[in-house]
Amino acid sequence: TEGPDFYIPMVNTTGVVRSPYEYPQYYLVNPAAFAVLGAYMFFLIIIGFPINFLTLYVTLEHKKLRTPLNYILLNLAVADLFMVIGGFTTTMYSSMHGYFVLGRLGCNIEGFFATLGGMISLWSLAVLAIERWVVVCKPISNFRFGENHAIMGVSLTWVMALACTVPPLVGWSRYIPEGMQCACGIDYYTRAEGYNNESFVIYMFTFHFLFPMFIIFFCYGRLLCAVKEAAAAQQESETTQRAEREVTRMVILMVIGYLVCWLPYASVAWFIFTHKGSEFGPLFMAVPSFFAKSSSIYNPIIYICMNKQFRQCMITTLFCGKNPFEGQEEDSSTKTEASSASSVSPA
């Protein structure tokens, strides 16, 4: 059922469909599902906010973390905080009431900040992939990734994110409630006159999903090849073999984390876009969005907690200046040094 500023995934044969801005949507799913959604959002908030805020705090506390590469990692934490503060809190609040209680303006604000955080995060991963490819594979001889390059990379993530999230605010597509009608996203659902949803969705999928996904797969594919070549050149070096396994594990986790977070949501959104008029339930879009929102937890775990330097500084901060695991970290220093010498360090 299509309204002036909403789309309900239900045929209004019984006349029960109501605006998601004004009435509870308990006719869509069991009311318990809204409680589950609220609890899930609360879980993401209590986990996502502390771990991303801790990342920012630790970086400010430890000067040695203020390196060009870590600018991009820090940008990931900022993006995740946008999602937590701007998106998860409003979704949790709306789910407690069973509908989007913040109105049309609130939908624009929530949709903008949630999408902005996701786009900044996605483009940060792409920039990080480019940085790893350039540093490890050295396609440009004598190139050194410096502060100016990092600032350019971070700026690029914001420019590309805004290029995707601002148009729906000014008339090229729009933000509407989706799934269980407690969160807002891009209008994949309608051909509403005057919004040109079709052209925007094609633009968004091409330049803000497929393109960064290609960058990530290309760069990490080349990175993996470089690690294997380095190991093949030093077959007797156990430390290099360990470095290869470490990088391989990290790359696999990066790709899996990316796909788990975004591929289900993007696939369902594209299906809805290309099959307008098909019947589907509210959970058809709500469940994939759960995976996309969980990226606020995956990102710091994969990209920061697996970084030795970040991990050491976090432990030092949490234990008030002392690292109780310092002996274990020293035992792994040989591997880290050999990894760096071979230009295959994952961190």
UniProtKB/Swiss-Prot annotation:
Cytoplasmic side: 59-70, 131-149, 222-249, 306-347
Placement of sequence motif 'Ionic lock' involved in activated form stabilization: 131-133
Nucleus is among the record's keywords: no
Post-translational note: Phosphorylated on some or all of the serine and threonine residues present in the C-terminal region.
Pfam families per UniProt: 7tm_1, Rhodopsin_N
Region Disordered: start-end pairs: 326-347
Positions of the record's site feature: Plays an important role in the conformation switch to the active conformation: 110
UniProt-recorded name of the protein: Rhodopsin
Lineage start: Eukaryota, Metazoa, Chordata, Craniata, Vertebrata
The encoding gene: rho
